[in-house]
Amino acid sequence: MLTKRIIPCLDCDLQVPEGRVVKGVEFKEIKYAGNPVDLATRYYEMGADEIVILDITASYERRATMADVIDRLTENVFIPICVGGGIRKVEDYTKMLKAGADKCSTNTAAIKNPELLTEASKVVGSQAVVVGIDAKRRYVDNPSDAPDKNVVETDEGYCWFDCSIYGGREFTGMDAIEWAVKCQELGAGEILLTSMDGDGTKEGYDIALNKAINDAIDIPVIASGGGGNPAHILDVFQKTDVSAALAASIFHFNQYSINDVKQYLKENNVPVRL
């Protein structure tokens, strides 16, 4: 049985020389959490299975990617690193991988130019091509109210999931389930799935969203958005077949350690690497 992965996420603001890690609520209300190199090193030493580093300003402000940060970070961190933000062309993938990253995640650029996924997968391999999907619930009274969408029944009512771009600043009207299927067809090797409704709230992962996407595709899904305690992480692993859970707030602000989470999962019969 494959072990489930626990992945800390570093949302980076590179407007200061060393970079700084930030965390918000529903992509807003930003708080500062520390230096990306220091935090990544700490999480590696705590037993993280992988680290996701997102340049949250690159796509919106059209600034350069964070190759220099990755280069410094990988001097002391020896687990897979996934980098996102400002990945717009195949050369960005190769630049990040040469700097020491193992995977690159793209959101906006993939939606604007889906063929990027095919081109990148041919050059760097599907295993290095991750698509970030930032999805928000759109409620409807009945499935017939959205005939061209994949409507899901949740405890809160019927809804479909709308893809956003530019760090949650713009919505596309694209169905997230349909887009995930398309990403797999185009050559993506993994989906980083963030619930915009849950992001930073620490109220639990969106089970309906994660189950719907995971059940529709064969490539791994990383659940993101809403993890507030070990029970939330257990919940998403027990109720869906996602391969990994990503969290930020609970680790950045020392509420729980990665080892706390893994011990709890092991005690509840979830396979993890200790």
Curated annotation (Swiss-Prot):
UniProt-recorded Gene Ontology molecular function terms: imidazoleglycerol-phosphate synthase activity; lyase activity
Domain of life: Archaea
A Gene Ontology cellular-component term: cytoplasm
Keyword check for Lyase: yes
Locations listed in the record: Cytoplasm
Any Pfam family matching the protein: His_biosynth
Catalytic activity: 5-[(5-phospho-1-deoxy-D-ribulos-1-ylimino)methylamino]-1-(5-phospho-beta-D-ribosyl)imidazole-4-carboxamide + L-glutamine = D-erythro-1-(imidazol-4-yl)glycerol 3-phosphate + 5-amino-1-(5-phospho-beta-D-ribosyl)imidazole-4-carboxamide + L-glutamate + H(+)
GO BP annotations, alphabetical order: L-histidine biosynthetic process
EC number: 4.3.2.10
Catalytic site positions: 11, 134
Pathway entry: Amino-acid biosynthesis; L-histidine biosynthesis; L-histidine from 5-phospho-alpha-D-ribose 1-diphosphate: step 5/9
Keywords: Amino-acid biosynthesis, Cytoplasm, Histidine biosynthesis, Lyase
Entry similarity comment: Belongs to the HisA/HisF family.
Subunit structure: Heterodimer of HisH and HisF.
Biological role: IGPS catalyzes the conversion of PRFAR and glutamine to IGP, AICAR and glutamate. The HisF subunit catalyzes the cyclization activity that produces IGP and AICAR from PRFAR using the ammonia provided by the HisH subunit.
UniProt protein name: Imidazole glycerol phosphate synthase subunit HisF
Organism for this UniProt entry: Methanobrevibacter smithii (strain ATCC 35061 / DSM 861 / OCM 144 / PS)
